[in-house]
């Protein structure tokens, strides 16, 4: 049994993005996040991003992506963006 417990937190933007989704996908993402908290190492599920986004990790939930920053010193996974895979990486103007 693991002694480490990860905490998940959402930025205001990610929280708004989550609330804007249809209820079934919102619930699926919430379940995924609860499962992430139980892992010894959240990197076992996600994939590192590259280039200018290399400080972030992505998690796939169906056609949606969670973009996160993993803070090992705080055992925190900070969700910074949630969106459809076709839109989530686009820069807002």
Where are these regions (language model features)?
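Enriched for short, Lys/Arg-rich terminal
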Residues: 1-7, 16, 27, 61-64, ...
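Residue-level recognition of oxygen-bearing side chains
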Residues: 13, 54, 87
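Surface-exposed, Lys/Arg-rich phosphate-binding patches that contact polyanionic backbones
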Residues: 13-24
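Residue-level signal for well-ordered alpha-helical positions
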Residues: 21, 32, 91-92
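Generic structural signal for secondary-structure transition and capping sites
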Residues: 23-26, 38-41, 87
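Short, well-structured alpha-helical segments
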Residues: 26, 30-34
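A short, surface-exposed loop/turn module that caps and links secondary-structure elements
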Residues: 34-59
């Amino acid at each position: 049994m693991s002694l480490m417990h990860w905490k998940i937190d959402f930025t205001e933007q990610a929280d708004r993005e989550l609330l804007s989704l249809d209820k079934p996908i919102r619930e699926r993402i919430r379940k995924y996040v609860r499962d992430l908290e139980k892992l010894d190492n959240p990197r076992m599920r996600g994939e590192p991003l590259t280039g200018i986004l290399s400080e972030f990790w992505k998690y796939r939930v169906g056609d949606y992506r969670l973009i996160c920053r993993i803070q090992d010193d705080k055992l925190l996974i900070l969700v910074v963006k949630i969106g459809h895979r076709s839109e989530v990486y686009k820069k807002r103007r």
